[in-house]
Structures are given as structure tokens and as C-alpha cells.
């Protein structure tokens, strides 16, 4: 009878701990994938309060991004790691990067350190979601549950603007010229 009780106890412990091991392994795989990722090139679809925009981006850790939008205004978004510029034919907006949600999204060290401490939330069978709150902004970062790649983010800013960006056609660790991250001038 003692052997049976011991077996039942061990079986019970294994059943309880197995999901935790699987759960933590997804986090570890995402962290390891982030550590191995120096840059990404991807197509994107962005929804800002119902306005849909598409384009292509090159992201280089830490904190650099260049995006060319598919629109008639030739909109670009550029961060050199310190500043962020959104420029089009008729607009030029310059921001300190640390005042924007991209400061967090483009900071690999921040993501890794905080993913270690946060719980995962499965949105569905395809994505793993991590939620961060910083400077009155809610930021959700999405990772593919199969290959552990960054596949998007959602930001609710202090003005209650909801911006959701999904990444597709992702290519990792290409040779990238830093010149593309040069802040454009206002013309």
C-alpha cells in the first residue's frame, strides 16, 4: 500500500509540474530566439484606430528601425536609436525615441529581462503574448508559438489610441547597412 501511495503521489506531482515545465520552456525558447536575433526584415500590416497601413521594415537591435509604407505619401518611419522621425510628402514629425512605445518594442534587453519575469498569455494556439505597462502605455508583444519569432505588437497609449502591428515574411539576421537608420532631414 505504501508503494501505491508513493506512486500516486509522484504521478500527481508529475502531472502538476509537467505543464509548468512546458510553459516555461516556451518562455525560454522565446528568450533564446531573441538573444540570437540581431535584426529582422518584415512586411507589416498596421491598424491604428481603424486606419490600415502596410509596408516593409528593417529592424536592428538595439532600437533602430526603418519602415517604408505602401502609400502615395511616401511615408517613412526611422529610428537611429535615439530619435524617431515619421516623414511623408506633407508631414515631418520628430520625437525622442524614449517617449514612444517603440523605445520598449525595439529594446531587446528590456524584452528579455521582462519576459523572464512576466507570465505568458496564450491569445490563441498561434501566439504567445506578453503585456508591459510603462509610462501609462499598455504594450502587448506577440511571438509565434511555433518558431518563437516576434510577430507583432499592440499599443494602447495615454490618449487611448490603439495601434496593432502584425509582421509577416520575416527574415532574420541579414547584412544591413546602418545608413538606412540615418534620420532624414525636413525638406
Model-derived features: positions:
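A short, Trp-centered hydrophobic/proline-enriched beta-strand micro-motif
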Residues: 32-52
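Gly/Pro-enriched, hydrophobic low-complexity segments
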Residues: 113-187
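Sec-dependent signal peptide cleavage junction
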Residues: 25-34, 186-187
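Boundary at the C-terminal end of the N-terminal hydrophobic targeting segment
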Residues: 19-24
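Bacterial N-terminal signal peptides that target proteins for export
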Residues: 1-9
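An acidic-aromatic
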Residues: 57-105, 163
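Flexible, surface-exposed loop/linker segments and immediately adjacent secondary-structure boundaries
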Residues: 89-127
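Bacterial N-terminal signal peptides
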Residues: 10-17
Amino acid at each position: 500500500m505504501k508503494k501505491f501511495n508513493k506512486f500516486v503521489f509522484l504521478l500527481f506531482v508529475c502531472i502538476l509540474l509537467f505543464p509548468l515545465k512546458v510553459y516555461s520552456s516556451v518562455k525560454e525558447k522565446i528568450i533564446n530566439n531573441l538573444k540570437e536575433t540581431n535584426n529582422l526584415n518584415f512586411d507589416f500590416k498596421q491598424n491604428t484606430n481603424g486606419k490600415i497601413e502596410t509596408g516593409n521594415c528593417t529592424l536592428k537591435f538595439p532600437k533602430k528601425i526603418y519602415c517604408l509604407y505602401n502609400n502615395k505619401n511616401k511615408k517613412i518611419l526611422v529610428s537611429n536609436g535615439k530619435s524617431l522621425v515619421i516623414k511623408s510628402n506633407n508631414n515631418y514629425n520628430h520625437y525622442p525615441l524614449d517617449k514612444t512605445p517603440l523605445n520598449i518594442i525595439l529594446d531587446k534587453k528590456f524584452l528579455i529581462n521582462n519576459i523572464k519575469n512576466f507570465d505568458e498569455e496564450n491569445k490563441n494556439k498561434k501566439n504567445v503574448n506578453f503585456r508591459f505597462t510603462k509610462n501609462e502605455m499598455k504594450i502587448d508583444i506577440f511571438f509565434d508559438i511555433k518558431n518563437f519569432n516576434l510577430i507583432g505588437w499592440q499599443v494602447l497609449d495615454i490618449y487611448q489610441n490603439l495601434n496593432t502591428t502584425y509582421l509577416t515574411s520575416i527574415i532574420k539576421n541579414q547584412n544591413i547597412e546602418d545608413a538606412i537608420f540615418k534620420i532624414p532631414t525636413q525638406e
